[in-house]
Swiss-Prot record:
Alphabetized UniProt keyword annotations: Cytoplasm, Glycosyltransferase, Purine salvage, Transferase
Pfam name, any one: Pribosyltran
Organism this protein belongs to: Rhizobium leguminosarum bv. trifolii (strain WSM2304)
The protein's enzyme class: transferase
Gene Ontology cellular-component annotations: cytoplasm
Protein name as catalogued: Adenine phosphoribosyltransferase
HAMAP family (alphabetical): Aden_phosphoribosyltr
Length: 181
């Protein structure tokens, strides 16, 4: 990805200081999603490393990962799998507990959403500490999926999430980096 595209995408992301608490800068992609050119470029760049590769499913993490993941799945002619918070899916699920910055939560997916051996890419808007992405990777592997990559619009490298995923053998692709929290 060229520097102009990186700059354009970074400029389309709103930064909100002291949200949700003092000292945090919230990176809001709703402005990127609302800008047709930036949204298209972001999706094109998320898809680029996988062009020409058979990817069976895109797993999008609640909630912004649903928006981006659906678009990525469409472009790659892949199926889409929502990974949701506990209690949000109506059929038989598989579930895993995962670590958050300040506690533990659970995520789940339909048990039959991915078949053993299928190649899956994780998609979300942002990787920070990596708790959600690591949990999703473990959940998918628990049912036999091959997690071949993870892509995010934003990386907050100071928080170490990318490194945690890479330590699990997941190739990580991001578009924009922001320092700090």
């Amino acid at each position: 990805m060229d520097k102009n595209t990186t700059s354009e995408l970074a400029a389309s992301i709103r930064s909100i200081p002291d949200y949700p608490k003092p000292g945090i800068i919230f990176r809001d992609i709703t402005t990127l999603l609302g800008n047709p050119r930036a949204f298209r470029r972001a999706v094109d760049e998320l898809v680029q490393p996988y062009a020409g590769t058979k990817i069976d499913k895109i797993a999008g993490m609640e909630a912004r990962g649903f928006i981006l993941g659906g678009a990525v799945a469409h472009q790659l002619s892949s199926g889409f799998v929502p990974i949701r918070k506990k209690g949000k899916l109506p059929h038989e699920t598989v579930r895993i507990a995962y670590s958050l910055e300040y506690g533990v939560d659970e995520m789940e997916m339909h048990r039959d959403a991915v078949q053993p051996g299928e190649k899956v890419i994780l998609v979300d808007d942002l990787i920070a500490t990596g708790g959600t992405a690591v949990g999703a990777t473990k959940l998918l592997r628990q049912i036999g999926a091959e997690v071949v990559g993870a892509c995010f619009v934003i990386d907050l490298p100071d928080l170490g999430g990318r490194k945690k995923l890479e330590e699990l053998g997941v190739v990580v692709h991001t578009l924009v980096e922001f320092s700090g929290h």
